[in-house]
């Protein structure tokens, strides 16, 4: 069912060369032209950090790979806002990962379904699709 989706960092990484790691139903939904799919600046930041720490092998540095791939998929950028940052104070402290917590707040603020394999997201008041 087409809708508005926000990609967690993991599926964003998977779609950059490990597409088979994303379930077929998820790939189909994201490819539906009626679906609006966002990626967050937060994920770009997380990918860059992991790459610099040597924890994320890529064919080239993220600044060269990501813009090309994001354009290929037609995903839209969701900027980090002050409202999202301050929204962290209203989020239960179930999970400590700052990137994930900001993505949860962004999904709530935009009414987006969060696309993620991370089961901990189910403990938050956000809809998750995987």
What spans do the regions from the language model cover?
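Short, basic/glycine-rich phosphate-binding loops at helix/coil junctions
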Residues: 3, 46, 84
